[in-house]
A protein has these predicted regions:
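Extended alpha-helical targeting/anchoring segments
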Residues: 1-258
Length: 258
């Protein structure tokens, strides 16, 4: 909780508007990657799930988020920002109504949308960047999320490296302003993120791109595994609540080890 509180203090000092702080969880157990992936997909199905197996490690992710999707000259991003716990016995409609009217969650999401619009605008033609979905609620096994979709038409002669530089890392796991906030994340977080909050996907021969955000993930070695989760800190955040939210996000993965 001290790190979350330190992030909030840096915001009060004017260093950032929003900081996405993550924490790592470690389990000293042997995990079968294929079984873990199967369990995760059954418990928490998500559209961007994947399993990567190598000789030295495996990476399992059940990501719901698209960072970059390029189809011909259209570039799209689908940021997720804002989280509510989903309880077994709840009036879903009333919970969603409260979620959509929560000032902190709405402010967090709006800042994220502005950040991603700016990122898209740097590589898209003027006047083409638009919101096609705004602040919609998507429900998963343990959580409700606020989601928006933003797209634009790419400028002529834009190179792949320019797109990747503009859009990565995704704003939903950094905060804003992006560069300064990443510097604060580097100061505050005690662990290197590794593949967590990176991207995985396809770069097609025809120039199309599909890259997700590596969250809801588990990095598996022979005798141990790691998972990591993060939450957004804004000026009116409660450090204890954000710490609890991070635990909720990690729970779906940690339960696979039991």
């Amino acid at each position: 909780e001290k790190i979350f509180d330190a992030a909030r203090v840096s915001i009060l000092d004017g260093e950032s508007y929003q900081i996405k702080i993550s924490q790592r969880y470690e389990a000293g157990v042997r995990v079968n990657p294929l079984i873990a992936f199967d369990k995760l997909c059954l418990a928490n199905p998500a559209p961007e799930a994947f399993l990567l197996q190598t000789k030295s490690f495996s990476l399992v992710s059940c990501s719901p988020e698209i960072v970059i999707e390029k189809n011909k000259d259209v570039l799209l991003t689908r940021p997720i920002g804002g989280t509510y716990e989903r309880k077994k016995k709840e009036d879903t409609n009333s919970v969603i109504e409260c979620f959509l009217n929560d000032p902190k969650e709405v402010a967090e999401h709006n800042m994220l949308v502005d950040l991603e619009r700016n990122d898209l605008s740097s590589v898209c033609k003027p006047g083409t960047v638009r919101l096609t979905r705004f602040r919609e609620v998507e429900t998963y096994a343990h959580l409700h999320h606020l989601v928006s979709t933003i797209e634009g038409k790419l400028k002529d002669q834009i190179h792949l490296s320019e797109i990747l530089s503009a859009m990565l890392p995704g704003g939903s796991i950094t905060g804003c302003p992006k560069i300064r906030t990443m510097e604060w994340i580097d100061k505050l977080e005690p662990c290197f993120r590794g593949p967590y909050t990176g991207s995985f996907g396809l770069l097609s021969d025809n120039g199309d791109i599909s890259l997700n955000l590596i969250i809801r993930s588990m990095l598996i070695f022979d005798d141990c595994c790691y998972t990591q989760s993060g939450g957004g800190i804004v000026v009116d955040s409660n450090a204890g609540y954000e710490y609890k939210e991070n635990n909720l996000k990690a729970r779906a993965l940690l339960e696979l080890l039991s």
